[in-house]
Amino acid sequence: MAGNSIGQFFRVTTFGESHGIALGCIIDGVPPGIPITEADIQLDLDRRRPGTSRYTTQRREPDQVRILSGIFEGVTTGTSIGLMIENTDQRSQDYSAIKDVFRPGHADYTYEQKYGVRDYRGGGRSSARETAMRVAAGAIAKKYLAQKFGVQVRGYLAQIGDISCDVVDWDQVEQNPFFCPDASKLESLDALMRELKKAGDSIGAKITVVAEHVPVGLGEPVFDRLDADLAHALMSINAVKGVEIGDGFAVVTKRGSENRDEITPQGFQSNHAGGILGGISSGQPVVAHIALKPTSSITVPGQTINRQGEAVEMITRGRHDPCVGIRAVPIAEAMMAIVLMDHLLRQRAQCGDVVSDVPRW
């Protein structure tokens, strides 16, 4: 079955291709009475939108969202919400040279082998352009989470290449095109991007996303653990090759005595687990990290084959990002928000009447 949907109670289905007429999504399970406008959704779409800085693809799409259904007089009605974004700046001619050639590192070869046909224009369905609708759906989830539970979901660029960015100032994240929380690293990041553009090459990145004030109890053991669903959602983002929850792979070198999150009457003393224990949220901040590969759409010549199996030298044309991780921050936020909203609705349905005497912090 086609994997175009995510979620059970809060279910998001997306459709559309990079160079098609439009992108869209259907969102089921949104409770009625939530104030939502196109402007609310547009705020996050503008953060992801291409062509807004010299460090990202120069494809200029307004990404203007249209609400088709499910919202009346500014509030959700409880019925399916339909959203659409028109594609306006396609340059399909840029891809005519790869019609019969498989770009190395891309989905061209695997899509062709799976379906026997592929839309070669900008990667078709495999393009990161599809994530615009995830961000649109995530904006609705973020609004619900904040309004009903005080949950705040936000992300930042944690690393590009060898340049690491610590959280010095959360406010700084929205003040620069890198989503970097450390202003002292901006000059180095700018120099790296210039170097990559000159060389026609690309670089990978690490993004961190944090959800604060998440209620205790979210997650459905054993197969729908909160961390399992988060890993699934984040791993589905284009170019993501790794997901960590909490300290992730760093736990390999730790002792149990230092990794366990000890509890006192005042609360947890650490958060190595990333806010999830036994697949269930602990009430601490939920923390996840994703690693994104360097894009293969570069002008450095590389080896591949054509449809006839003949050796071909490949140079990718078109408009591309030297680091796809830069625009991944709002996408990662959206996927975490979608998963959290789905689990909040599932928790309310099954355990809404449960009252525990155990302290919460």
Swiss-Prot record:
FMN binds at residues 125-127, 238-239, 278, 293-297, 319. The keyword Flavoprotein applies. The keyword NADP applies. NADP(+) binds at residues 48, 54. InterPro entries: Chorismate_synth, Chorismate_synth_AroC_sf, Chorismate_synthase_CS. Reduced FMN (FMNH(2)). GO terms for molecular function: chorismate synthase activity; FMN binding. Pfam families: Chorismate_synt. Belongs to the chorismate synthase family. Homotetramer. This is Chorismate synthase. It comes from Yersinia enterocolitica serotype O:8 / biotype 1B (strain NCTC 13174 / 8081). The lineage of its organism: Bacteria, Pseudomonadati, Pseudomonadota, Gammaproteobacteria, Enterobacterales. The gene is aroC.
